[in-house]
């Protein structure tokens, strides 16, 4: 079954990412990985991770819950990723991010 990413929030301090996804119903996926699931990407979950672009990638899924707008807004409002703060800079000052390559182009 394919899952479509609607939105993703990264929490670098705890190495957890959250994605709002669609797969017959709207869900919130809580996971840990060094990959970024960007909005619009389509992936297939497996026992050890996900298949994305015909590659099986390691992802630890901690929880999948039905989408709740209030919970999603709380997650988005408490995100720690500086890429979405509106600061105009190419530097990331968060040195604890699990992602090796910033999906927002920060260095």
From Swiss-Prot:
Places the protein is found: Cytoplasm
Protein name: Anti-adapter protein IraM
InterPro entries recorded: Anti-adapter_IraM, PmrD_sf
Organism of derivation: Escherichia coli
Keyword Aminoacyl-tRNA synthetase: no
UniProtKB keywords: Cytoplasm, Stress response
Keyword Protein biosynthesis: no
Family per similarity comment: Belongs to the IraM/RssC family.
Superkingdom of this protein's organism: Bacteria
Coiled coil: none
Gene: iraM
Outcome, altering residue 15 to G: In strain: E32511
Role summary: Inhibits RpoS proteolysis by regulating RssB activity, thereby increasing the stability of the sigma stress factor RpoS during magnesium starvation.
Swiss-Prot/TrEMBL GO biological process terms: cellular response to starvation
NCBIfam families for the chain: PRK09919.1
A cellular component term, taken from the record's GO annotations: cytoplasm
């Amino acid at each position: 079954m394919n899952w479509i990413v609607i939105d993703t929030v990264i929490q670098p301090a705890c190495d957890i990412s959250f994605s709002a996804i669609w797969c017959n119903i709207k869900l919130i996926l809580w996971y840990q990985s060094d990959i970024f699931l960007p909005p619009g990407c389509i992936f297939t979950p497996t026992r050890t991770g996900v298949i994305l672009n015909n590659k099986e990638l390691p992802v630890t899924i901690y929880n999948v819950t039905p989408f709740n707008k209030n919970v999603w807004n709380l997650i988005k409002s408490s995100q720690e990723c500086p890429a979405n703060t509106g600061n105009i800079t190419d530097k990331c000052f968060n040195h604890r991010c699990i992602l090796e390559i910033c999906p927002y182009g920060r260095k």
